[in-house]
A protein has these predicted regions:
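Ligand-binding clefts/hinges and TM-proximal coupling segments of bilobed small-molecule sensing domains
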Residues: 1-7, 131-148, 185-186, 215-242
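Extracytoplasmic small-molecule ligand-binding "clamshell" domains
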Residues: 1-81, 86-88, 147, 220, ...
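Short, well-ordered beta-strand segments
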Residues: 16-20, 104, 123-126, 166, ...
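Periplasmic-binding protein-like
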Residues: 21, 97-108, 153, 170-215, ...
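Ligand-binding cleft/hinge of the Venus flytrap
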Residues: 27-33, 44-54, 93-94, 120, ...
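Hydrophobic residues within well-ordered alpha-helices
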Residues: 47, 69-71, 117, 157-159, ...
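A ligand-binding cleft/hinge motif common to bilobed small-molecule-binding domains
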Residues: 64, 81-89, 159-191
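Flexible hinge/capping segments at coil-to-helix
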Residues: 96, 105-123
Length: 242
């Protein structure tokens, strides 16, 4: 292993990994007295193993908070969705896995397709600064985005304000669908959230190592094995190779 790579990715001799605890698909065990477990932490463990260093988790409640700490020497790598706004401060690999994002609509809704949601007068509840919120912010032309801080809060807002649609990741919307009798998850997806590994800017050797790592773990079946290990088959899918 090149000393330059270790210097760029683990300058303190330990790999500090920013983990987004709000993504229940990627962090499936968030017990307070143990390290987080799931596909995302296991990917980080493998990065640290290949670097030959220890690992330290830096836990965040939202991905937006991770992005806020970019460039502040708070973490070395970050496992979050790759979005253009975040790429202004973070260099990303290609995605190692993907999650479908779509809408939940209430009982009796006239909205039957994703395309119908983006029209004047439609109000969409969304978790603020999530990867799919960033996508919607760039792409929604006519509907109004109503933001809440966190996944559960966005559902509560959707219900309390009687909004027209709730944006979210399909597996989480399936849970909300069970809570709201008569609600419907619209078919298809408006985007697929790309889960990637990021590092700080100007770490060319370190980034190249991470890029190669992600591609190798996709093609070798390592990512697929993690998805099966953590019981999220059908919720997460291995991203296509670069």
């Amino acid at each position: 292993m090149s000393p330059k790579i270790i210097e760029q990715l683990a300058p303190k001799g330990v790999l500090r990994v920013a983990i987004n605890l709000s993504n229940f698909l990627l962090v499936s065990d968030r017990s307070a007295d143990v390290n987080p477990a799931g596909v995302s932490p296991d990917m980080a463990v493998e990065v640290a193993r290949r670097l030959g260093v220890g690992i330290e988790y830096v836990e965040y409640k939202t991905p937006g908070e991770i992005a806020d700490d970019a460039g502040k020497d708070a973490w070395d790598i970050a496992n979050i969705g790759a979005e253009p706004q975040r790429a202004e401060k973070i260099d990303f690999t290609r995605a190692y896995c993907e999650i479908q994002a779509t809408y939940l609509v209430p009982p009796g809704s006239s909205l039957k397709s994703i395309e119908e949601v983006d029209r004047p007068g439609v109000r969409i509840a969304v978790s603020e600064r999530s990867a799919y919120d960033l996508w919607l912010s760039r792409n929604i032309q006519s509907a109004e985005l109503i933001r809440a801080k966190g996944l559960d809060a966005s559902y509560d807002l959707f219900v309390s304000e009687k909004l027209d649609a709730l944006a979210g990741l399909r597996p989480k919307l399936m849970e909300e669908n069970e809570k709201m009798a008569g609600s419907t998850i619209l078919p298809g997806q408006f985007t697929a959230v790309q889960q990637s590994i990021g590092c700080g800017k100007n770490r060319e050797e370190g980034l190249a190592f991470l890029v190669a790592f992600v591609e190798e773990t996709k093609t070798s079946g390592f990512v697929a094995d993690l998805i099966e290990k953590h019981g999220v088959v059908g919720c997460l899918s291995v991203a296509p190779p670069a």
